[in-house]
Amino acid sequence: MLIQILLIGVSVSMDTFAVSIGKGLTVKKLRGLDALKTALWFGGFQALFPLLGYFAASTFSKYVTAVDHWIIFGLLALIGGNMVREAFEEDEENAKETPEFDWKHMLPLAVACSIDAVAVGVSFAFMTLNIWLSVVIIGITTGLFSAAGLYIGRVFGSRWQKPAQIAGGVVLILIGLKVLFEHLGFLG
C-alpha cells in the first residue's frame, strides 16, 4: 500500500511539476528561497485537498460502499485522463505566467493544481490506508517535484513538461484499474 500511495503522490504532483517547469523557464535567476516557497505552496495544498476530500467522503461512505471500487476507478481514471488530455493542449496561460513567487501568484496556482487532489482524497475514503501518512507523502512528494521542476525548467526548458504530465495521468488510470480489478476478483 505504501508504494501505491507513493505512486499516487508522484502522479498528482505532475501538474505542479509541469507548472514549476513553466515558472522555471521564466526565471532569470532562481534562488533557493523561490524553490522552497514553491515546494511549500504546492506541497501544502496537494496535502490539504486530499484530506478535505477524504473527510467529506468518509462522512458518506456507509451509503456508497457497494460501489466504492467504481468510484475509485472513475475518479482516478477521470483525473488521469484529464492530465493526459491537458498534456496535448496548448497552455497559453502558463506561457504568459510571471515568475513571481509571492502569495498573489502562488495561491491561485496552488489551488488550481490541487483541485484534482480532492477526488484522490474521496477515493482514499474507500481504501484501507492511513490518511495522515498518505497526505504527508503526497505533500512531500509534490514539494520535491515542484522544487525540482523549477530547476529543470531553468536548465532544460520545456522538453519534459508534456511527458511528465502524460506519465502521471497514465499511472493514476492504472491504479484505478488495479483497485477495480482487485474488487472484481481479477487480481488476488
From Swiss-Prot:
Question: What name has this protein been given in UniProt?
Answer: Putative manganese efflux pump MntP
Q: Predominant location of this chain?
A: membrane
Residues that span the membrane, as ranges: 1-21, 40-60, 64-84, 105-127, 131-153, 166-186
Determine the domain of life of the protein's source: Bacteria
Keywords in UniProt for this one? Cell membrane, Ion transport, Manganese, Membrane, Transmembrane, Transmembrane helix, Transport
Q: Write down the species.
A: Bifidobacterium adolescentis (strain ATCC 15703 / DSM 20083 / NCTC 11814 / E194a)
Q: Which Pfam families match?
A: Mntp
Its biological purpose is as follows: Probably functions as a manganese efflux pump.
